[in-house]
Amino acid sequence: TPNGADALRRAIAQHLYRFRGISAAPEQIVVGAGTEYLYNLIVQLLGREAVYGVEDPGYSKAARIYALGGARTAPVLVDEGGVSLRSLEMSDAQILHTSPNHQFPTGAVTPIGRRQSLLRWAEAREGRYIIEDDYDSEFRFTLRPIPTLQSIDRAGRVIYVNTFSRTLAPSPRISYM
């Protein structure tokens, strides 16, 4: 199918449930050649009119991809607990791109209380979503994993994105959402 091979999507669904606590049907999973491709799909899905909040400092390539897709971006400051709620609320972002499990470049891990606050932010207004970029989350050796935003989202406001480029090999560029 255009969303990825059925067997691969089934395997990803099992992996997500077992290791990240995410319950997703294989039909809900989209496989792509790299996260850049998936970010472009997200802009097509959620719209170019929306303002995409990106972490500052953060993965600058995401902001460039959103801008190339015709979307406007807004910087959202990061502190020792990840995305600053105050900065997010002061921005005009409708969609937040965040890496709560291992923020780049700070390495901050967003605590569960702030994750719940981020979900409340998304639920507070129609058209708000969170793109959870879980890149590099498999490499947590000292701390117990905190639940992903997607696994505790009850309102369907989180789009989970990850890749196998760090765990398998960088060459295949297999990413999924």
Question: Residue locations for each model-derived region?
Answer:
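Conserved core of the PLP fold type I
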Residues: 1-129, 137-159
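Active-site PLP attachment segment
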Residues: 151-177
